[in-house]
Amino acid sequence: ERFDCGIMVSASHNPYYDNGIKCFNHNGEKMEEELLLEVEKYMDGLTDLDLVTGDHIGEYFEWEDGLEIYMSWLKECVPVDLSGMKILCDLANGSATSTAVETLDSLGATVEAISNSPNGININNKCGSTHPEALQRMMREGDYDIGLAFDGDADRLIMVNSDGELCDGDYILYICSRYMKS
């Protein structure tokens, strides 16, 4: 809304020590490949860098309305009524911990979360979309309609049905296309 670009430091679906950088354009979309290559070339050319630490790193600010605006946008993208649904979410101790439960709850679902206590080093650690075993077990043992497993930065999702079976991306696309057709 008010920014020309954005940068996310993320391990995505990797361990915390494999952080990388994701760049976004002014629309919040992934930056165009041509521009990314230009940025990478510029960064590769920097050889005489002084590393900074502590108070010298930079400026931190919190965009107070950012989370609310983002969650409203998510609900606009998929305006569904989830009333009566019981959803179990594996949040991978990642970024979905601040949005998933509240967003799904506001759409009417009853939501329970696991891997919902990030501490900076437990992201994706034997949980989330790369390790859905606990979610699968809880789906078989519990009374849930659907299980959702995110990766650390919540840009990947796998689903688990009430029998604990994984639903791959093809099946998720099938569900989405049926919904859009109806």
Where are each of the predicted segments found?
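Ferredoxin-reductase
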Residues: 1-26, 181
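Short glycine/serine/threonine-biased micro-segments
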Residues: 4, 18, 26, 92, ...
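Structural motif
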Residues: 4-7, 22, 86, 110-112, ...
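Short beta-strand segments
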Residues: 8-12, 90, 149-151
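Short, ordered loop/turn segments at secondary-structure junctions
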Residues: 11-12, 28, 36, 116-117, ...
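Glycine-rich nucleotide phosphate-binding loop and flanking beta-alpha elements
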Residues: 14-15, 95, 154-156
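Gly/Ser/Thr-enriched, mixed-charge loops and adjacent short helices
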Residues: 19-140
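Acidic, glycine-rich loop-and-beta core segments that form the ion-binding/anion-interacting portion
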Residues: 128-182
